[in-house]
Amino acid sequence: MPKSGKKPPGKREARKIDRREAIVEVAKRQFLDNGYAATSMSAIAAELGGSKATLWSYFPSKEDLFAAVLDDATSAYRQQFADLLRPSKDMPSAVLQFTRSFMAKLALPEPLRLHRLIVAESGRNPELGQLFFERAPGPTLALLKDFLADGMASGQLRQADPQLAADALT
């Protein structure tokens, strides 16, 4: 058994995980290429070479599938930011490092395409904008706000409203 205490997945479970990842990859490409409204579950199923029933068994709605795409697109950078926003003896340098990493991430092609998609679709589908905020900037803002509040409490950063400071940095 691995050190994490979790049993490794069996073949069937591993296939399910692989299939889910493949669905999310195809959906991401479809959403980015065609937009949310123009992407259908039928088109995703056709590209995968499977049935809509299989697709629905993994994701009960297009919104759930889009949420999985957002989670996939943001999980790696969210972990990177969480690692950067650990308590530090040099909080100002840590804030600077976070800001540089954040701006570098936003300038990459895929995040730019994702942001454009959200902006383009949010007018017709405001729930999509809310879903994006809850999955992407929201958790990052919460991490940064808590980090800044800790720095302010320890005296390493000037006292201010940590939420306003986090908003200003992002």
Regions found by a protein language model. Give the residues of each.
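Basic, helix-initiating cap at the start of DNA-binding domains
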Residues: 1-34, 38-50, 57-64
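Hydrophobic packing within well-folded, soluble alpha/beta domains
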Residues: 23, 27, 31, 44, ...
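Helix-loop "lid/cap" segments that line or gate small-molecule binding pockets
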Residues: 100-107, 115-123
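Membrane-interface starts of transmembrane alpha-helices
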Residues: 158, 162-166
